[in-house]
């Protein structure tokens, strides 16, 4: 089956054998000469030899004896050159026969080294051999050592004289070699150095035996309890014995009760278990007795007997863990035997060996004996003026190589001393390396210290062959020019300058001149065109009629950056662009340029018309909203016309038709803004002339639009019209609105004057008030009530609030004022600047605030705020200081733009690469899976509504109204606005819908899982390249937003921090997961991390859900009624608190001056705060600062203090005492005294704050901060502060984590070493003799315990299953759980961001997908960017495509191999049919770069990044690219397998109809 235009449909990459290289070659290059300096003809047998590579001129030999086409194919007898086209100099290879074999550096120095991996040597060792530093010795086994050698992991199989031997390889220095191997008598050793000997060893490798051996070594890696049995004992005795020992140990530990005497003979428990497993002993699972024979019911043998016995005993005694725990432990014993790196290396080597076996490659071909010389025209030598030459670097590299090669041949012929020959061989090897890849090992530079470009450099990077010439080519029939606005154009037109059109359409014009008889020949026509005769223009007009052209504006960030238009010929040299298509191109007319391309073929023209025409691209594919909208002047005109003015001329008049009203308006009887009544249909409508005129522009039969039109309402209007009437009518409507908008804006004569910026009268009062509040904050700070960080946070908060208040005051003043224009009184709404901002025409409230309110806070480059706000505005002017502060933000904006544009561009490139082969491949994949879709809620606030998330999706199950039980929508319905509105009204909160994440199509995605094509509002059609659309939709806003930072000029607006919970709708509140304490003022304090408050309506349906932070004060009781606007809870947003849960005396432990805490004395206030901070690293090990509350009932509550926490105890209550520090004394072996803080009878009450941890200071959030977060998520990187999450449900216990405990008593110090046990005492505790320190260690003395803690151990224990998990937490990390808390799977135990891999492992693939989607959406939402979920889902799907094999079963995979999920599923199906053992695999998360590099297509991966590595791997494994993706087809010049390049469209024939009749659009 042939696909596309090319005669093949797959491409395989292999290593070239020497014979293959010779078959390409047309002769050997023996001399390093290039051209003769006098004749400038190529030297014979040189690098440009005409005899080898072909003639310099078409059909002419070098000496000139044969000239002309008639001698084609003749070989000249004088100069030996074949008479043919000179073009063959671009395709004929030569070759160089190397005097000694040389290694190919790609296979030598890739990581891991391919040659090294096959020989089981490290990259360093194999390099030493190749570069003649060390000897390689092959050690053959003696007959009695054969078995040992073949079982050893460190040997490799070779075939010698037809027999396979397992041999050991040694890399030894010259001295070692001389000493140990050189004079060995027995014939066991072969040795040599350099590539030649390595080639010999590679050629005798027995690959089949090698693959078998590696599989055998890897086999036990997957073993578990199920594999126990005689076979395992036979093949893997050591491992088998370890597991038997472990089981015996567990039988003893849990008193499982298995008898140890058989027929009166006493046996060890190990032997009994071995007997049961090997099926020679039977076990009664109820009594634990054993016997030689099967005695009926309850008697079992083999490993299952042990399992049944365990389960039976557990039924009696719940303290024994479930048997799964034992199985898990057995698995861990196996894993301990295999280090991760070892398994990885084994798998890599096995893959390589199997690659060689499958691909018919030979390992010795990685060492070159013949080197190809590429055609001379691809490494040209060009004569410049003045007798100089410009040459390609390759010629220099080939010259060095030929020189060294010839010298080596001469030395060998002369029988030179070994040391000289060896050095020359090494130099030859180095010159081969440099030719293939300069810089991999040493760099060769030109005279100007520039590294020479090697063959690899011609492939890789932006300037390499892939990206420069194959993925992006310069095209003919194109031109570029500056753009200007063309307001009179229709939407599908563009103005094309005549001179440009003439050049672009030249061939068409020639043809038309001939057809019309103006010219008799092409030559004649050319002449006419050159002279620009009048007939030429006439023909040009006819030619361009209905011949679309493509316009493109760089940077091409999404598909709307290229659109088709019908050209309209215009005078001048500038392209005219329709104003409405500026937003999709992101174009303006300040000097932007655009490129024009002419589609030549009839198919191309048809595609341009049907698919790319601007009227087809009204909706954005990123979110389905209109992207072609009136903007700026047009919005202003429409806004102006649609506003009322009370008391305008003609107010209150009544008209019986629109026409009457227009007549009155034309006769100046009524004003355009006057409120009048007009009969529309059967009713009288209150409206004005402006609105009537706007409705004239709307489609016939559309509802009467009677509202003020600003940018948002216009957008809704256009979307609605598009929904009802489709693209064509919408385009016409837009054109009419454009005309009217421009006209009204002109008529209104709106302009900006300095007087329009009204400075609010309240400003001075508000600013003064803020300064007064600032003084209060400073005062609190000086008194030491708050810390410096809190002061900063409060300052920012005050100024953010003040700026907001000033802005409000300014707007309300503008709205109340009056304008007088031409003697006409207009309300404040008509203030020109206000009107521009309010209508969305230009500018926004922020900019208005800066013009007439106050500039507010400015951001530093680090993202923090400068505390001094700019209280002036631009109308008043800034003071010098204020101006200086301003420059900060403005400069940040410009620097950001430069840096972040490239960052966003690179992100887009990675996204495109990872998703490029996602194409709609079928209508329905038939999956039964679905996603549960619900609104995205972030800290109690709904960020993305259910409706927004559902539109355009396909339902997976029927939906019924939860109350009336009637059917709302059926499965497989596509959800549009009406259906989603009905679903929401019914109060459905979760909907099961189809999703890209669950699509089961083999390649690509199916239409049903994808849903709507958002730019067409209909189910996506097959062949749509949805992956690339997704990448563009995510990447484009990134680029946009980073480019847009500097427009605000750095005036930062801090988000006012949420510090209270305000109810939005009345109802009944319900608490879930809150734990409340009454504090000394009677207030209720929440001490749960998981608290949620729900608001329910009278029917008990949830209408709001809010999370409540720890330490929030709750102001209502559970179940009370609340009204809208009630404050239910409030908290301090700037601190995390540690709260006393009980009353009692407060005791400080290990709070030591200048050791575990530092006193922060404030220079301004003279107040002191005590901050936890370890001054030396080892202090953190020796001391654990904590607060203990001793309650009246004798209980102790202990609170660890994390780093940076501040004690909330009045400084004057703290006393200090010098005392001996037992831990330090012990560590430093002499008395160490510390200054301890202590409290004298200090009592606390429940709810008291005993310490606080200040949160990070408020920073400016813009997408510049957000883009790195998006990248962190898509690349699956580790966050800076990873959280620990629980893997099981259970109760939390917290222990000290230490290696030793000391008890210090008057008699002396006693040390106890702790090994893998839990410490039952706390640091600093007084212990009595006999107190348990751990389960097995008891204190021999009474005294004070010193625990040298590294941190804490959190143990989660599940009583039902007996499972427990232990987590080590380093010192200084904040624990979110306390002793005795109950946690669920996936709950966070410490602060920080959870690791994506952990979420995957613990909560599963669905939770991870939800998490990723939400996190990415939040970053964009924060910027007000709408991206449909499905685009992000496509990228996430690509990140989760891979599975890692846990147990290969009977499959062709090996353990730990990463395979594509589709491949895995196919293999599972195959094995199911054959009734074999099914392989097991786990999903893994792969970052987008790695995902793009590990795609099936090696062409696509090589053109993305790390070209040489990808090609090396592809060649050694003999990979086949089946050309299924888009990118690889672009590279080889095929039609792409998407859109109209699909197979279905192959047979569509297109003809040009001579007489075009008026065709109606089929609806």
Curated annotation (Swiss-Prot):
GO terms for biological process: DNA-templated transcription. Mg(2+) binds at residues 588, 590, 592. GO terms for cellular component: DNA-directed RNA polymerase complex. Zn(2+) 1 binds at residues 61, 63, 76, 79. Its cofactor is Mg(2+); Zn(2+). Zn(2+) 2 binds at residues 925, 999, 1006, 1009. It catalyses: RNA(n) + a ribonucleoside 5'-triphosphate = RNA(n+1) + diphosphate. Binds 1 Mg(2+) ion per subunit. Binds 2 Zn(2+) ions per subunit. GO terms for molecular function: DNA binding; DNA-directed RNA polymerase activity; magnesium ion binding; zinc ion binding. SMART domains: RPOLA_N (SM00663). Its EC number is 2.7.7.6. Keywords: DNA-directed RNA polymerase, Magnesium, Metal-binding, Nucleotidyltransferase, Transcription, Transferase, Zinc. DNA-dependent RNA polymerase catalyzes the transcription of DNA into RNA using the four ribonucleoside triphosphates as substrates. Belongs to the RNA polymerase beta' chain family. This is DNA-directed RNA polymerase subunit beta'. It comes from Hydrogenobaculum sp. (strain Y04AAS1). The lineage of its organism: Bacteria, Pseudomonadati, Aquificota, Aquificia, Aquificales.
């Amino acid at each position: 089956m042939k696909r596309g235009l090319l005669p093949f449909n797959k491409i395989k990459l292999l290593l070239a054998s020497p014979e293959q290289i010779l078959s390409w070659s047309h002769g050997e290059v023996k001399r390093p000469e290039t051209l003769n300096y006098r004749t400038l003809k190529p030297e014979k047998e040189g690098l440009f030899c005409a005899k080898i590579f072909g003639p310099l001129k078409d059909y002419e030999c070098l000496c000139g004896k044969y000239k002309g086409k008639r001698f084609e194919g003749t070989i000249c007898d004088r100069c030996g050159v074949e008479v043919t086209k000179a073009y063959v100099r671009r395709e004929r290879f030569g070759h160089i026969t190397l005097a000694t074999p040389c290694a190919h550096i790609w296979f030598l120095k890739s990581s891991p080294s391919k040659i090294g991996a096959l020989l089981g040597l490290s990259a360093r060792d194999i390099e030493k051999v190749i570069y003649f530093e060390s000897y390689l010795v092959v050690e053959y086994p003696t007959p009695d050592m054969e078995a040992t050698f073949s079982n050893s992991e460190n040997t490799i199989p070779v075939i010698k004289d037809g027999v396979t031997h397992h041999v050991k390889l040694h890399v030894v220095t010259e001295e070692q070699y001389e000493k140990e191997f050189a004079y060995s008598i027995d014939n066991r050793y072969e040795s040599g150095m350099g590539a030649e000997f390595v080639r010999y060893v590679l050629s005798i490798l027995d690959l089949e035996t090698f693959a078998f051996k590696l599989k055998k070594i890897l086999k036990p890696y997957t073993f578990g309890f199920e594999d126990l049995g005689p076979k395992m004992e036979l093949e893997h005795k050591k491992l088998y014995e370890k597991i038997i020992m472990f089981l015996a140990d567990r039988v003893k530990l849990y008193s499982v009760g298995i008898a140890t005497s058989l027929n009166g003979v006493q046996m060890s428990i190990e032997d009994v278990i071995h007997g049961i497993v090997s099926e020679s002993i039977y076990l009664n699972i109820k009594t634990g007795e054993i016997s030689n024979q099967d005695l009926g019911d309850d008697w079992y043998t083999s490993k299952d007997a042990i399992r049944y016995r365990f389960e039976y005993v557990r039924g009696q005694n719940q303290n024994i863990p479930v048997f799964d725990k034992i199985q898990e432990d057995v698995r861990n014993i196996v894993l301990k035997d295999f280090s991760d790196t070892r398994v990885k290396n084994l798998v890599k080597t096995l893959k390589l060996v199997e690659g060689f076996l499958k691909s018919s490659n030979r390992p010795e071909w990685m060492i070159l004996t013949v080197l190809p010389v590429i055609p001379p025209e691809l490494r040209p030598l060009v004569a410049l003026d003045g007798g100089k030459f410009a040459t390609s670097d390759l010629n220099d590299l080939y010259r060095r190589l030929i020189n060294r090669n010839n010298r080596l041949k001469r030395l060998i012929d002369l029988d030179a001393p070994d040391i000289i020959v060896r050095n020359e061989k090494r130099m030859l090897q180095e010159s081969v390396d440099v030719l293939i890849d300069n810089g991999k090992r040493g760099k060769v530079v030109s005279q100007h210290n520039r590294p020479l470009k090697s063959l690899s450099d011609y492939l890789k990077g932006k300037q390499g062959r892939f990206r420069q010439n194959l993925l992006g080519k310069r095209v003919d029939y194109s031109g570029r020019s500056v753009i200007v606005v063309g307001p009179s154009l229709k939407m599908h037109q563009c103005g094309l300058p005549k001179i440009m059109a003439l050049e672009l359409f030249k061939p068409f014009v020639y043809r038309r001149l001939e057809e019309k008889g103006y010219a008799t020949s092409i030559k004649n026509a050319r002449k006419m065109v050159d002279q620009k005769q009048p007939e030429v223009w006439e023909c040009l007009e006819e030619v361009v009629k209905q011949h679309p052209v493509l316009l493109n504006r760089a940077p091409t960030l999404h598909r709307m950056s290229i659109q088709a238009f019908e050209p309209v010929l215009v005078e001048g040299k500038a392209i005219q662009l329709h104003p409405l298509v500026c937003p999709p191109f992101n174009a303006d007319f300040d000097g932007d340029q655009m490129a024009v391309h002419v589609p030549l073929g009839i198919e191309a023209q048809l595609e341009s018309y049907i698919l790319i025409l601007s009227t087809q691209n009204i909706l954005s594919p990123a979110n389905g909203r209109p992207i072609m909208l009136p903007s700026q002047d047009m919005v202003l005109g429409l806004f102006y016309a649609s506003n009322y003015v009370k008391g305008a001329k003609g107010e209150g008049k009544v008209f019986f038709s629109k026409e009457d009203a227009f007549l009155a308006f034309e006769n100046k009887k009524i004003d355009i803004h006057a409120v009048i009544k007009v009969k529309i249909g059967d009713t009288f409508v209150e409206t004005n002339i402006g609105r009537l005129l706007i409705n004239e522009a709307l489609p016939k039969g559309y509802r009467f639009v009677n509202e003020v039109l600003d940018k948002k309402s216009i957008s809704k209007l256009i979307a609605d019209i598009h929904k009802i009437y489709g693209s064509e009518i919408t385009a016409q409507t837009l054109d009419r609105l454009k005309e009217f908008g421009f006209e009204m804006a002109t008529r209104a004569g709106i302009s900006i004057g300095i007087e329009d910026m009204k400075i609010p009268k309240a400003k001075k009062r508000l600013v003064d008030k803020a300064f007064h509040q600032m003084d209060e904050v400073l005062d609190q700070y000086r008194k030491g009530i708050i810390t410096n960080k809190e002061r900063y946070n409060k300052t920012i908060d005050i100024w953010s609030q003040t700026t907001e208040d000033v802005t409000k005051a300014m707007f309300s003043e503008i709205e109340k004022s009056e304008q007088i224009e031409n003697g006409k009184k207009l309300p404040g709404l008509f203030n020109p600047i206000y009107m521009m901002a309010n209508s969305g025409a230009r500018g926004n409230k922020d900019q208005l605030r800066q013009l007439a309110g106050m500039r507010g806070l400015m951001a530093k480059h680090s993202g923090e705020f400068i505390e001094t706000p700019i209280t002036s505005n631009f109308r008043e002017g800034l003071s010098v200081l204020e101006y200086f502060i301003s420059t900060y933000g403005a400069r940040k904006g410009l620097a950001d733009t430069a840096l972040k544009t490239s960052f966003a561009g690179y992100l887009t490139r990675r996204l495109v690469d990872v998703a490029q082969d996602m194409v709609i491949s079928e209508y329905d994949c038939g999956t039964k899976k679905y996603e549960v879709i619900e609104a995205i809620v972030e800290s109690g606030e709904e960020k993305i509504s259910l409706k927004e998330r559902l539109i355009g999706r396909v339902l997976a199950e029927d939906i019924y109204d939860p109350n009336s039980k009637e059917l709302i929508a059926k499965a497989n319905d596509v959800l549009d606005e009406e259906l989603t509105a009905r679903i929401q009204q019914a109060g459905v909160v979760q909907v099961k819908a189809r999703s890209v994440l669950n699509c089961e199509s083999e390649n690509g995605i199916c239409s049903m899982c994808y849903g709507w094509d958002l730019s067409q509002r209909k189910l996506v059609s097959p062949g749509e390249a949805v992956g690339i659309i997704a990448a563009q939709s995510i990447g484009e806003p990134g680029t946009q937003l980073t480019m847009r930072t500097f427009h605000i000029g750095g005036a930062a607006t801090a988000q006012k921090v949420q510090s209270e919970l305000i109810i939005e709708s009345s109802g009944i509140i319900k608490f879930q997961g809150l734990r409340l304490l009454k504090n000394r003022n009677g207030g209720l304090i929440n001490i749960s991390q998981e608290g949620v408050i729900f608001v329910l309506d009278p029917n008990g349906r949830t209408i709001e859900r809010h999370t409540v932070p720890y330490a929030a004060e709750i102001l209502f009781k559970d179940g009370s009624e609340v009204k809208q606007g009630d404050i239910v809870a409030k908290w301090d947003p700037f601190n995390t608190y540690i709260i006393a849960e009980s009353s009692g005396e407060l005791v400080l432990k290990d709070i030591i001056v200048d050791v575990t805490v530092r006193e922060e004395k404030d220079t301004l206030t003279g107040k002191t705060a005590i901050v936890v901070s370890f001054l030396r690293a080892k202090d953190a090990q020796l001391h654990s600062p904590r607060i203990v509350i001793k309650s009246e009932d004798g209980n102790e509550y202990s609170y660890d203090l994390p780093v940076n926490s501040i004690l909330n105890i009045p400084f004057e209550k703290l006393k200090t005492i010098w005392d001996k520090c037992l831990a330090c004394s012990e560590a430093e072996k002499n008395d160490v005294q510390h200054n301890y803080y202590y409290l004298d009878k200090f009592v606390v009450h429940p709810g008291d704050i005993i310490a606080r941890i200040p949160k990070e200071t408020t920073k400016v959030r813009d997408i510049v901060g957000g883009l790195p977060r998006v990248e962190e998520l898509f690349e699956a990187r580790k966050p800076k502060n990873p959280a620990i999450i629980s893997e099981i449900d259970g109760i939390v216990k917290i222990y000290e984590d230490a290696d030793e405990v000391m008890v210090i008593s008057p008699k002396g110090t006693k040390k106890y070493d702790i090994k893998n046990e839990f410490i039952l005492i706390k640091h600093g505790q007084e212990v009595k003799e006999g107190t348990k320190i751990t389960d097995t260690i008891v204190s021999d003395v009474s005294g004070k315990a010193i625990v040298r803690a590294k941190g804490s151990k959190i143990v989660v224990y599940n009583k039902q299953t007996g499972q427990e998990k232990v987590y080590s937490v380093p010192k200084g990390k904040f624990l979110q759980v306390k002793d005795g808390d109950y946690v669920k799977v996936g709950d966070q135990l410490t602060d920080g961001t959870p690791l994506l891999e952990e979420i995957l492992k613990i909560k599963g693939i669905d939770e991870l997908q939800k998490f990723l989607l939400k996190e990415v959406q939040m970053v964009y939402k924060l910027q007000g960017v709408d991206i449909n979920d499905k685009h992000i889902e496509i990228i996430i799907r690509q990140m989760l495509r891979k599975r890692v094999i846990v147990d290969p079963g009977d499959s062709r995979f090996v353990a730990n191999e990463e395979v594509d999920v589709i491949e895995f599923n196919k293999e599972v199906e195959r094995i199911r049919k054959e009734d074999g053992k099914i392989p097991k695999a786990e999903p893994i998360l792969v970052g987008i770069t790695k995902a793009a590099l590990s795609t099936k297509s090696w062409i696509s991966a090589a053109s993305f990044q790390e070209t040489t590595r990808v090609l090396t791997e592809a060649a050694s494994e003999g990979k086949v690219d089946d050309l299924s993706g888009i990118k690889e087809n672009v590279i080889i010049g095929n039609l792409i397998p998407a859109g109209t390049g699909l197979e279905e469209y192959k047979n569509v024939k297109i003809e040009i109809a001579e007489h075009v009749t008026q065709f109606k659009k089929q609806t």
